[in-house]
Amino acid sequence: DTARVMREVLERPIKKVPALQGFTVATVFFEPSTRTRISFELAARRMSADVVSFAAQTSSLQRGESYKDTLLTLEAMGVDAYVIRADSAGVSHQATRWVKGAVINGGDGRRAHPTQALLDAYTLLEALGTLEGKKVAIVGDILHSRVARSGAELLSLLGAQVFCAGPPSLLPQSLPGAHLTPRLEEALEEADAVMVLR
């Protein structure tokens, strides 16, 4: 419901609500990103938050500063919420122990990308009306994809049958919530939606 309300906000001439006025959100990207970082920055600004954009390439990380020290420095500067993307699994989870503010996982090594899964589920729900009993195929490099991992988990929780297809060398041994197959035609047969990974 909140996503639909925010979608209506985007259709207004002035795309802003005061929900986060007075809050500071830091997008802390320890690895490069375009779509995820900009999406979060726009969302925070549209909810009237002040936004600090952190880029690892131009930070003290280049001189050996740890993720923890970087986040503690931002906390000392008054940051209220952190959107974190890291190439190492578990950084977002660890961050919840290091800082008092809210932590949003914007991509976590090969392990997870829950916010992308939420967006994909929302898109599919808008297109299909429901995910209950729908067949969703995820195709590509499943083994190394945090998008496939998070997507399969969430879509199956929402009632979808998830089939992941890729070459045998790019399929994990198992993936909670998904049927794995090296046969593309099996995944695509009677699929209601197809997600193709890069």
Question: What is each residue range found by the language model?
Answer:
Residues D1-L42:
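Positively charged, low-complexity intrinsically disordered leader regions
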Residues A3, V79, V99, G159, ...:
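Short, well-ordered alpha-helix to beta-strand connector turns
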Residues T27, Y82-I84, M195-V196:
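Redox-cofactor binding/interface segments in oxidoreductases and associated redox assembly factors
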Residues F30-L42, E126-R198:
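Glycine-rich phosphate/diphosphate-binding loop of Rossmann-like nucleotide-binding domains
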Residues M47, W98-K100, L158, P176-G177:
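Short, structured coil segments at secondary-structure junctions
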Residues S48-L61, A160-P172:
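Short beta-strand elements in bilobed, periplasmic/extracellular small-molecule ligand-binding domains
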Residues Q62-R63, A112-L119, Q173-L175, E190-D192:
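Short, charged, surface-exposed secondary-structure boundary motifs
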Residues D69-L154:
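Anion-binding alpha/beta catalytic cores of soluble intermediary-metabolism enzymes, centered on
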